[in-house]
């Protein structure tokens, strides 16, 4: 029996050696590009909220506080209304992700991604033309619905289309596009920072990535699993043949037979209540992991760092332009780390990257806290010299690198691959909803936490990183290389979760 810290031998779970074809690559690139809109929004928000014309128009009280010479550096931008601008998107995303479970089950993954793209596009246009707070928040809500739909559908699409052996690498593409969106947004913020209407350009250009991914989705087919679950057997066969290649007809028939078996369970599940099904004892391991992992991802502190990096860097002594450059460097390092993870994820596995990244992030959070403590102190009235400020940037870059190969991509990958088809749309929706809820809570409270906890805020996140690393060591089984429809075996062989699962594939 495998222990909590050991990999499981489930190589017999599937003997289908699906090849990488041009159709697989193109379909996965298009689906992964849904991450662009999420990343762009993460990157654009923090930069826009430091632009003087934006603050003058919508948040003059924040601008007044920032201009006061004796303001505590920890509390410069502590405004619930300002954070509401950023975090309102995630309330809408939470609602949309729950609705998306029904949409993906009834209309497919592809349709849900297209709907998300259109919704995000309209939200971007409203934000770019915003004349008051009401328009600004309304646009953010539409953006939230857009990312709620795409964040639910895209990871599932990738897990269902990618060959099992390379599922990790293809699924990480979603996180890579998120990071590319962040980097692009940082560059745009830097370019528009000095313009009077720069904030309008930054917010309005969110329509560009939305248009790119929406148009791309029009040219790909839905996943075979989704088509079968909706009773479209012939279309599923055609889609699978296109993805795997006509020269692999034997493997296609074998894989199709396995998908048909799984789809029958999904069709039967339509008559069952969502909560009744997913709360069954046999799905307890899936549910716990799918809820805990997105919560832990946000408790690393990475998203609030991405939102408020320009604010943070300005607080420790950088000017507006240098702060945006430092934020760009942070995003670029994260992207590089993500690209590295695509090359090693299916070799070293999920657990190793989770643990290695967790240790690195923990050390960096402690180091940043110590640095802030000895420079600006607990009162926040001290002055941080440029050398120390640069050190903070370096530490946060190392931290971002650790996140980029661990909790960044794997928090999207693991929940999308662990659920059986019967509850996969509902399970992924729940996981994404939890992610949005945690993001909202932390983004809404981060600036207040920084103001109240001072440098202790970084120790707070460090404590959570320690906790989540222990959780991975003890309770997360290895899933690399296992076909998604044979994933039940990892739970049946896990030292703890086996007590909840039955020795069947249902």
Curated annotation (Swiss-Prot):
Pfam families, alphabetized: Sugar_tr
S-S bonds: none
UniProt keyword terms in alphabetical order: Membrane, Sugar transport, Symport, Transmembrane, Transmembrane helix, Transport
Recorded GO MF terms: monosaccharide transmembrane transporter activity; symporter activity
InterPro entries, per the entry: MFS_dom, MFS_STP/MST-like_plant, MFS_sugar_transport-like, MFS_trans_sf, STP/PLT_plant, Sugar/inositol_transpt, Sugar_transporter_CS
GO cellular component: membrane
Topology versus the membrane: Multi-pass membrane protein
Signal peptide: none
CDD domains listed in its UniProt record: MFS_STP
TM stretches of this protein: 20-40, 81-101, 117-137, 141-161, 168-188, 201-221, 287-307, 325-345, 352-372, 390-410, 430-450, 456-476
Compartment(s) where it occurs, according to its Swiss-Prot or TrEMBL record: Membrane
Ranges in the topological domain labelled Cytoplasmic: 1-19, 477-506
Predominant place of localization: membrane
Entries under SUPFAM superfamilies matching the protein: MFS general substrate transporter (SSF103473)
Main function: Mediates an active uptake of hexoses, probably by sugar/hydrogen symport.
Assigned protein family: Belongs to the major facilitator superfamily. Sugar transporter (TC 2.A.1.1) family.
NCBIfam families: SP
Full protein name: Sugar transport protein 5
Gene: STP5
């Amino acid at each position: 029996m495998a222990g909590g810290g050991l990999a499981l031998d489930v190589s017999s779970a599937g003997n289908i050696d699906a090849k990488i074809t041009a159709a697989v690559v193109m379909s996965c690139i298009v689906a992964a590009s849904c991450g662009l809109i999420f990343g762009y929004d993460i990157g654009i928000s923090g930069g826009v909220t430091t632009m003087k014309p934006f603050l003058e128009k919508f948040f003059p009280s924040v601008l007044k506080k920032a201009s006061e010479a004796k303001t505590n550096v920890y509390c410069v931008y502590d405004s619930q209304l300002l954070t509401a601008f950023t975090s309102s998107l995630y309330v809408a995303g939470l609602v949309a992700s729950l609705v998306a479970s029904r949409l993906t089950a009834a209309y497919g993954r592809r349709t849900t991604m297209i709907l998300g793209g259109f919704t995000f596009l309209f939200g971007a246009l409203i934000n770019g033309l915003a004349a008051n707070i009401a328009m600004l928040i309304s646009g953010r809500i539409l953006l939230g619905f857009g990312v709620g739909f795409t964040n639910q559908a895209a990871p599932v699409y990738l897990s269902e289309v990618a060959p099992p052996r390379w599922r990790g690498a293809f699924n990480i593409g979603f996180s890579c596009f998120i990071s590319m969106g962040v980097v692009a947004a940082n560059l745009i913020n830097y370019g528009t920072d000095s313009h009077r209407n720069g904030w309008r350009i930054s917010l309005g250009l969110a329509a560009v990535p939305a248009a790119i991914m929406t148009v791309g989705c029009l040219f790909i087919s839905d996943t075979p699993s989704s088509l079968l679950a909706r009773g479209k057997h012939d279309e599923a066969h055609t889609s699978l043949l296109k993805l795997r290649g006509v020269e692999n007809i034997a493997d296609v028939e074998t894989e199709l037979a396995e998908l048909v078996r799984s789809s029958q369970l999904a069709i039967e599940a339509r008559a069952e209540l969502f909560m009744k099904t997913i709360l069954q004892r046999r799905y307890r391991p899936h549910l716990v992991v799918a809820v805990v992992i997105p919560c832990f991802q946000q408790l690393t502190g990475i998203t609030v760092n991405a939102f408020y990096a320009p604010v943070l860097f300005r607080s420790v002594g950088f000017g507006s332009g240098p702060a945006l450059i430092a934020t760009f460097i942070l995003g670029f390092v994260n992207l590089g780390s993500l690209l590295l993870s695509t090359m090693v994820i299916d070799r070293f596995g999920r657990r190793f990257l989770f643990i290695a990244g967790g240790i690195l992030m923990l050390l960096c959070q402690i180091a940043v806290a110590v640095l802030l403590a000895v420079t600006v102190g607990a009162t926040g009235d001290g002055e941080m010299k440029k050398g120390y400020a640069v050190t903070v940037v370096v530490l946060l870059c190392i931290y971002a690198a650790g996140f980029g190969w661990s909790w960044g991509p794997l928090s999207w990958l693991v929940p999308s691959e662990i659920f059986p088809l019967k509850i996969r749309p509902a399970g992924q929706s729940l996981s994404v909803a939890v992610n949005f809820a945690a993001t909202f809570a932390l983004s809404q409270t981060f600036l207040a936490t920084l103001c109240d906890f001072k440098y202790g805020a970084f120790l707070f996140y460090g404590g959570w990183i320690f906790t989540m690393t222990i959780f991975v060591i003890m309770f997360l089984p290895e899933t690399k290389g296992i076909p998604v429809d044979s994933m039940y075996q990892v739970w049946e062989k896990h030292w703890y979760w086996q007590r909840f699962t039955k020795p069947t594939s249902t």
